[in-house]
């Protein structure tokens, strides 16, 4: 019995340690978001996640060229208009792809904000709805102007 208690305590400590970096990043993103300046962005419309992309877990993507973008997304012009144009010379993409689900799920971009010390926060909201008779891959993607400096930028994702 004593050994079981020790194993459980060690397991709990291990889980706490593994979650610390996630919680630290979440806390940092919230603090940066509060002090940051809004950045204009364009929500990408009429795209879909390709069916050969692994959608078993959440993916946070930063894409700066068309070839990489096309590895993840396809154009869905038949779904109500032309896909949003991206100027790859001036813009990059921040995308969030959630795991495949059988629930109606929408992801809405809330804001993109930046700080003086090269941090960018992409905040979004997730709305889950009713159960579906099929599966879907919820995602959102926004185009943001590339920074004028070539300095490394740290990007945080923050669910609101």
Model-assigned labels for residue ranges:
Residues 20-160:
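Exposed, flexible binding/inhibitory loops of compact, secreted disulfide-stabilized domains
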Residues 8-17:
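Bacterial N-terminal signal peptides
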Residues 1-5:
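Positively charged n-region of N-terminal signal peptides that target proteins for export
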């Amino acid at each position: 019995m004593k050994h079981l208690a020790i194993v459980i305590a060690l397991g709990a400590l291990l889980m706490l340690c593994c979650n610390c970096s996630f919680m630290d990043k979440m806390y940092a993103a919230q603090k940066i978001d509060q002090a940051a300046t809004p950045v204009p962005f364009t929500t990408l419309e009429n795209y879909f996640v390709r069916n050969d992309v692994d959608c078993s877990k959440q993916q946070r993507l930063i894409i700066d060229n068309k070839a990489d973008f096309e590895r993840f997304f396809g154009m869905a012009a038949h779904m109500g208009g032309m896909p949003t144009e991206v100027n790859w010379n001036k813009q990059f993409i921040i995308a969030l792809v959630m795991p495949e689900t059988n629930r109606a799920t929408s992801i809405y971009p809330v804001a993109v904000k930046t700080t003086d010390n090269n941090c960018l926060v992409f905040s979004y909201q997730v709305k889950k709805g009713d159960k579906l008779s099929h599966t879907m891959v919820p995602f959102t993607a926004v185009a943001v102007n590339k920074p004028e400096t070539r300095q490394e930028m740290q990007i945080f994702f923050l669910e609101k």
